[in-house]
Design a protein with these regions (language model features):
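C-terminal solvent-exposed extensions
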Residues: 21-22, 26-27, 81, 85-145
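Solvent-exposed, polar/charged alpha-helical surfaces in well-ordered, non-transmembrane soluble domains
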Residues: 33, 55-62, 76-80, 84, ...
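Generic alpha-helix detector with strongest preference for long hydrophobic helices that associate
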Residues: 16, 37-41, 59, 63, ...
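Short flexible/disordered coil segments
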Residues: 43-49, 68-77, 128-145
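Flexible, polar/acidic helix-loop-strand segments at domain edges
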Residues: 1-73
Length: 145
């Protein structure tokens, strides 16, 4: 998955050194570190990781939709690679057709509104209840005329 690296990230155990601003195709350990790593002693690192995850997912979906997934062998390979992590009653053909028709952008991604504060031991997230209710209504309800 191609991304513009958002944060300097190093994991010597995995042999990964990513530099902020670098345009990079992430595979294997680099992708793992990019979406999982956070500095627990740095306030806000969970939010930074979430931004990277959103970026990675968006790029991943875009790559799937613009790649050679139309070739059935590619779709089968992708399905087989993730099938151990899927629980679904949707058959393979329907799943592929749905994915091919899905247009995914960062505009389709929602984050619970709220505030992260430093607690006595850990970061604590407090949702904005009113804004969350508005988001739920916007996403799941349609006004009836």
């Amino acid at each position: 998955v191609r991304v513009t690296v958002m944060d300097d990230l190093t994991d010597s155990g995995r042999g990964v050194n990513l530099v902020a601003g670098e345009e990079k195709v992430l595979n294997g350990d680099e992708a793992y570190v990019y979406i999982r790593k956070r500095e627990t002693e740095t306030f806000g690192s969970a939010d930074e990781r979430l931004r990277r995850q959103e970026q990675f997912i968006t790029s991943f979906i875009t790559t799937l939709n613009t790649s050679s997934i139309e070739r059935e062998s590619q779709a089968v390979a992708i399905y087989n690679a993730v099938s151990d992590y899927l629980v679904t009653d949707v058959d393979f053909e329907t799943l592929v057709a749905t994915l091919l028709g899905y247009k995914y952008t960062e505009d389709n991604m929602y984050t619970v509104p709220g505030e992260t504060v430093q607690g006595s031991e850990f970061e604590e997230f407090y949702p904005d209840e009113d804004a969350l209710e508005d988001l739920i209504i916007q996403m799941f309800y349609k006004e009836v005329e």
